[in-house]
């Protein structure tokens, strides 16, 4: 929870646990972890150490702001700085912030027994006054902490600040979400085909780019040459690339094959939110086709073929594949590519489909 780094998000617990209180919610999480382990699953916890629920300078004082605003939050002569797009950016230069993050990580490993962490907007954790540093004290502390030596560390390697895109630049043993894999696979199987059908000309995708992603994205994950190693070598194995085509943000796989424009009207922002760079292809019709529509079977068959091709590319590429829940079942968000605010059928997984 961005309210407290030592508590799970209570809204994800059962109604009974929520009613019983915070300890019941925590016990439910511990039970979940034990049962997943018993079934052979590891548990990766999504953590948000780049900002808190207190938001920007005009946000509420709920925890850290009331304790020591200038020590915990990134400010410039008292003015809040924001590289996350949410306000309330924590200051990774601060010793108190580093202690807080490390204590939280140790707690989840030692008390709840999670197997690893996915760090939201992880570039923020490696920033100082000059920008991002792979040898930032906080990142070094995380990768060298004895309590964390056996856990998996996964970075979302960007934020919205200057120089925020840092894919491939995190220190070992971090793995990283590979946005280039996402973009190039989408371009090859979807956007490029859409361009060819409309203009007859090649699009933005290419065989060379796809081959690079299939081979482990060595163009991005051999940038770090540790002291004493010949130039061009790296300690980072192909698994450091977390390959994905879809995630919690953006189109689902089904929607990549059924929509070319975002349809976020339900979010209440006049469809201004969400990216317009979707690299998708609707195969001849925008959105779902009603029963009996002309060419419906032909279009649906083409969409399924493309989805299978994308999934095969993801699963067979060198690296660590990440599959968004529901993509294997054709889950749709009805063209909404920014469904974070939709706690309804738009974002739910329909297990009956």
Where are these regions (language model features)?
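Carbohydrate-binding surfaces of carbohydrate-active enzymes
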Residues: 295, 351-352
């Amino acid at each position: 929870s961005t309210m407290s780094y030592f508590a799970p998000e209570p809204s994800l617990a059962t109604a009974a646990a929520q009613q019983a209180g915070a300890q019941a919610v925590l016990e439910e999480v511990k039970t979940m972890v034990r049962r997943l382990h018993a079934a052979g699953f590891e548990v990766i916890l999504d953590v948000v150490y780049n900002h808190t629920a207190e938001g920007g300078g005009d946000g509420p004082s709920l925890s850290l702001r009331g304790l020591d605003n200038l020590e915990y939050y990134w400010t410039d002569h008292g003015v809040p700085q924001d590289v996350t797009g949410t306000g309330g950016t924590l200051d990774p230069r601060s010793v108190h912030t580093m202690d807080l993050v490390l204590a939280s990580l140790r707690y989840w490993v030692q008390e709840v027994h999670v197997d690893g962490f996915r760090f939201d907007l992880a570039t923020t954790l490696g920033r100082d006054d000059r920008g991002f540093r792979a040898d930032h004290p906080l990142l070094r502390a995380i990768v060298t902490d004895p309590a964390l030596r056996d856990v998996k560390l996964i970075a979302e390697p960007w934020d919205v600040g200057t120089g925020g895109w840092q894919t491939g630049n995190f220190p070992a043993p971090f793995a990283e979400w590979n946005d280039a894999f996402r973009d190039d696979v989408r371009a090859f199987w979807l956007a490029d085909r859409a361009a060819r059908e409309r203009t007859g000309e090649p699009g933005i995708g290419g065989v060379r780019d796809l081959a690079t992603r299939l081979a482990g994205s060595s163009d991005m994950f051999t940038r770090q040459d540790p002291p004493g190693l010949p130039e061009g070598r790296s300690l980072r194995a192909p698994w450091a690339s977390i390959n994905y085509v879809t995630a919690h943000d953006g189109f689902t796989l089904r929607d990549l094959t059924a929509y070319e424009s975002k349809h976020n009207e339900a979010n209440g922002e006049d469809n201004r939110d969400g990216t317009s760079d979707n690299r998708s292809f609707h195969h001849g019709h925008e959105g779902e086709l009603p029963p009996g529509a002309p060419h419906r079977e032909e279009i649906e068959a083409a969409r399924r073929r493309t989805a299978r091709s994308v999934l095969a590319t993801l699963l067979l590429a060198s690296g660590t594949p990440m599959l968004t829940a529901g993509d294997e079942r054709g889950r749709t968000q009805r063209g909404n590519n920014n469904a974070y605010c939709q706690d309804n059928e738009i974002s739910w997984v329909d297990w009956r489909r």
